[in-house]
Structures are given as C-alpha cells and as structure tokens.
Amino acid sequence: MLLLFTVVTLVSAAQVAPVTPQAAVPTQFLPGAQQKIGGVDNRCANKQVEGVQIFQGDMADCPKRNSEAANAMVQRAKQKALEIYNKEISKGPTPKDSGQCIERAVQGTDRCILAKIIDKAVNMLKYRISKVGNATALFRGNKLISLILNVDYGLKPFFTVVKKKTKRVFPQGDELNFNGIGQLIGVKGTFPQDNNDECKPCDSPKKTVETVAEECNLGCQLKGTPGLISRAIQKKEVKESSKDGEKSSTQNGEGTTDDEDGQQSPDGNGPE
C-alpha cells in the first residue's frame, strides 16, 4: 500500500511540475570542415555532427560533392568569360587592327588575329591557348587576345603540353601551349587586302582547316604577313637565333609579297 501511494505521488508531481527548457546545445561542426566552393554548399562537411556513425557515412559522398561543386564553379567561370568576350567582339575590330588581321568570316563570329601575334606565337613562350566552352582562346599572360569559335571553323589546332621549366610559367591543366598557330591562318573568310578572284570566302563554315586552306587561301596573300605565316606553318625550319638567317630566307622568297603599305618590317618579324 505504501509503495502504491509513493508511485501515485510521483506521477502526480510529474503532471503538475512546469516543463523546464533544456539549455540549447550548440551546433557542432567538424573543425575546419565547413566549406563552400564558389558559393555552392557541398552539403558534406558543414552539417551538424550528431554521431560518429552518421558522419562517417557522409564522408563517402564528400569527394564526389566537392568535385561537383568545383565543376559547377568552373562552368560558371567559362560562361562568364564567353559573355564578356561576346560583349567585346560586338564592338568590332579597332581601326588599328583592321589592316593587319584576318577579317570576319562568313558568319561574322571570329576575331581578328594580328600578324604580330602570329609571328610572336611561333616561339611558344608568351602565348597559350585554353579551351573555353566551345571555343579556343588565345592568351598572352592573363589577357585574352583572340577567341575562335570551333563550331565556325572546325578548328583542330595541334596541342602540345610543355613541361614546366625554371622561371617560366606554362599553362596548367587544359591550357596548352599554342604550337599549331599556322593552322589558324587556314580559316575561311576574306583578307584585308584587295581580294583576287581565286581568294573568296568558303561556302561551308564547318569544313576542316586543311580543306578551307585549299579552297580559300590558294593563291591568296595577307598583305604584309605572308612571310610570318609561312614561318608559322613551317615552325620547325625557323631559326630564331639568327636574324640574318631570317633576312636571307625572306630574300629567298619565303616572305615575298607586293607590300604596298610597307607593313612587313625588314627583319621579317612583322609590325612592331
């Protein structure tokens, strides 16, 4: 009887006693593990750690989610680069560029490639290419020099990964040195000089570079730059160490042209 009375008393006290709020337990995070990549929550390491077993179960997904977040960030960066580029090319080539570049192709989507860039890029030291979306970008340092839409040219330049050397910064990842610069000359389109009958724009924007070169550029000369183009295409035969050698090669016909504007410099290195 006494035991029954004690139980009833305890139950009654529990029913009338006010509920005391428990102290809030601070949210626990794994030290140094709260991460957001490019504003994308990876949902792996920034959740409350409620137990070791739960956390260990989540760890298997973290590398995958981190990778997905990083890829999303890269894609946004590439899209932004294309948007900036499209905004810039809508202005058209500058007067300074127009006389020394390959003009717009049939669809009007390419940018001019300066003869000076073609010449300087042969040494593969200052310029590099990088895949940006569906285009091939030509950089000097961090500055975007030219961007060629692959869909318009069927462009397939030769890429060669160059090993990193002392005191030289080479592209990383899918940024590769531009060692097929000569192929950029073989794109369809008109040139800034007075065009001959055999030098007209190509019909199809998706032909290969070789086909385009045969159909469009046979007999054509880009005023002031044929020597540069020839050396770019035949890069292995260029001896950059001797300017005298370059002069003699020009005199032997490599860079001959009717250069009425005098745009080719005497040493064959193009406009400075």
From Swiss-Prot:
Basic and acidic residues: bias regions: 234-247
Subcellular location field: Spore polar tube
Record field: compositional bias (Polar residues): 263-272
Domain of life: Eukaryota
Signal peptide: 1-21
Claim: Glycoprotein is one of the keywords in the record: yes
GO cellular component, one term: polar tube
Descriptive protein name: Polar tube protein 2
Native species: Encephalitozoon hellem (Microsporidian parasite)
